[in-house]
């Protein structure tokens, strides 16, 4: 069982199945839906670097806002803290991509903080004094959020505020930037490898 209480079925046989057979008769009008996520790493095909960094927001002693502390790979996340999720998209020189989408993978229980009103943050852009936090437009997805990128013609920084409500150890697929009308053209975080996040 997953921490959320739902069941997870893992294939135990040797090799991968090529078909699925059901025993018994199904009632008329029955429908079967099979969903799966491949654990096989995907390869990026677009010459764009996608870098993801998480920052924990720690309150400043004078109460004027927060200080952003960059986390390293493997650092534990706290369910009672607020985080900045930062992506930097960098295309190769002279390359321009239009109508793209950034899809950020999230673990169960994670959500984008919908309001950033009144939040002042120091340390994201080298600033020592807190400045108003501004986030990109986004839309919620299934265990993800998406940010439209109308045009990518140079380094672009995208940030959101995140909270984590569910504790556990989660394997996240790579986040990706892809072209809306050529979805096979994509760039991935961490060379497409799974990332493990621990939420306490």
Q: Where do the model's predicted regions map?
A:
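Long, domain-scale non-catalytic interaction/scaffolding regions in large secretory-pathway
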Residues: 1-200
